[in-house]
């Protein structure tokens, strides 16, 4: 099923539908737009017909210099059976030749009052967001001190309980159990909850609770960029866990690598506080402050000083 259709951008940007109403359900498959300036001159060899076509003052002013026959030919070739739509910006008058051709091919022709560059930018951002590669991950996404923390782990390890404690401590829930992740840009992953379970949290023994109703609108978010992955696992006495934090583990989601921390779970450990400190420490590292490296440097200096004293 197509993620975006022409009718979606008509509603989103409040576009005026001028003609070609039969084609408003055409799918939009790419976020790239086309400004068919060279096509107005008659060169259609590399015409990207599958894109939204955006006509501004430049294209239409050149179009007006053409003869009537040329105008008809250009618009006939501009309107194809795979063109999702043609948008006229700045509220400019729509050429009658375009209306005729669009009605024949059922290509929606829309008009916007926005300036061409602004419309192009907003439309591209919207389509990139909607058409971004997506995946779904089993886990909980929480906004902790402005850091999007994805908490993963096996069922029953305590992900939802940790999220509940974090919300009680003033942080915000984004998604529980299933996190839908979109790669909106290179290195940018944005997580959100499926519409069916938005703002809901499941606690074993309590059932499903509505976090917005219980804690207010300030306790939830609709989406958040993911910066850190924390994997909860049951404590294994035979496994060596990182005690210094010098080595940074990575996990790949879609085409993006994220920092991953593995936190062992055992009775008596306050996971919510650990997640809070992990988020703050992650922010410090991004600001250039690394406690593990500072300790390592101090230790090296102490060893070297000791060797000099021994000599």
From Swiss-Prot:
Q: Does the keyword Phosphoprotein apply?
A: no
The family line of this record is: Belongs to the HPrK/P family.
Q: Which residues does UniProt mark as catalytic? A: 138, 159, 177 (proton acceptor), 243
EC number(s) recorded for this UniProt protein: 2.7.11.-, 2.7.4.-
Q: A GO molecular function for this record?
A: protein serine/threonine/tyrosine kinase activity
Which protein are we looking at? HPr kinase/phosphorylase
**Which intervals of the chain are annotated as region Important for the catalytic mechanism of both phosphorylation and dephosphorylation?**
201-210
Residues the entry annotates as binding ATP:
153-160
By its UniProt entry, which CDD domains does this protein fall under? HprK_C (cd01918)
| Annotated stretches, region: Important for the catalytic mechanism of dephosphorylation | 264-269
Q: Which Gene3D superfamilies match?
A: HprK N-terminal domain-like (3.40.1390.20), P-loop containing nucleotide triphosphate hydrolases (3.40.50.300)
Q: Which reaction does it catalyse?
A: [HPr protein]-L-serine + ATP = [HPr protein]-O-phospho-L-serine + ADP + H(+); [HPr protein]-O-phospho-L-serine + phosphate + H(+) = [HPr protein]-L-serine + diphosphate
Q: Pfam families attached here?
A: Hpr_kinase_C, Hpr_kinase_N
For binding Mg(2+), which residues are annotated in this chain's numbering?
160, 202
- Keyword Magnesium present in the record's keywords: the answer is yes
Cofactor(s) it depends on: Mg(2+)
Question: Which InterPro entries does the annotation name?
Answer: HPr(Ser)_kin/Pase, Hpr_kin/Pase_C, Hpr_kin/Pase_Hpr_N, P-loop_NTPase, Ser_kin/Pase_Hpr-like_N_sf
Q: Name one GO biological process term.
A: regulation of carbohydrate metabolic process
Query: What information about domains appears in the record's comments?
Result: The Walker A ATP-binding motif also binds Pi and PPi.
The protein's job, in short, is: Catalyzes the ATP- as well as the pyrophosphate-dependent phosphorylation of a specific serine residue in HPr, a phosphocarrier protein of the phosphoenolpyruvate-dependent sugar phosphotransferase system (PTS). HprK/P also catalyzes the pyrophosphate-producing, inorganic phosphate-dependent dephosphorylation (phosphorolysis) of seryl-phosphorylated HPr (P-Ser-HPr).
The superkingdom listed in its UniProt entry is Bacteria
């Amino acid at each position: 099923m197509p993620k975006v259709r022409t009718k979606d951008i008509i509603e989103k940007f409040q576009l005026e539908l001028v003609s070609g109403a039969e084609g408003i359900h055409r799918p939009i498959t790419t976020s790239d737009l086309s400004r068919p300036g060279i096509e107005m001159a008659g060169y259609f060899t590399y015409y990207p017909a599958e894109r939204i076509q955006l006509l501004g003052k430049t294209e239409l002013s050149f179009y007006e210099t053409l003869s009537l026959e040329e105008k008809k030919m250009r618009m006939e070739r501009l309107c194809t059976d795979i063109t999702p739509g043609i948008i006229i910006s700045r509220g400019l008058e729509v050429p009658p030749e375009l209306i005729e051709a669009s009605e024949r091919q059922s290509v929606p022709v829309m008009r916007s009052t926005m300036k061409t560059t602004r419309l192009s930018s907003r439309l591209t951002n919207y389509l990139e967001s909607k058409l971004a590669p997506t995946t779904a991950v089993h886990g909980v996404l929480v906004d902790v001190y402005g850091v999007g923390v994805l908490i993963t782990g096996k069922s029953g390890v305590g992900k939802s309980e940790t999220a509940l404690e974090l919300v009680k401590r003033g942080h915000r829930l984004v998604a529980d159990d299933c996190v839908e992740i979109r790669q909106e840009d290179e290195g940018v992953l944005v997580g959100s909850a499926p519409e069916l379970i938005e703002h809901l949290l499941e606690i074993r023994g309590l059932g499903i609770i509505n976090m917005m109703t219980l804690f207010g609108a300030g306790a939830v978010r609709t989406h958040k960029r993911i910066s850190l992955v924390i994997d909860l696992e049951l404590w294994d006495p035979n496994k060596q866990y990182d005690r210094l934090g010098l080595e940074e583990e990575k996990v790949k989601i879609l085409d993006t690598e994220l920092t991953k921390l593995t936190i062992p779970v055992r009775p008596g450990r306050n996971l919510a506080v650990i997640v809070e400190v992990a988020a703050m420490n992650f922010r410090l590292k991004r600001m250039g402050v690394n406690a593990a490296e500072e300790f390592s440097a101090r230790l090296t200096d102490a060893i070297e000083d000791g060797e000099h004293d021994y000599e």
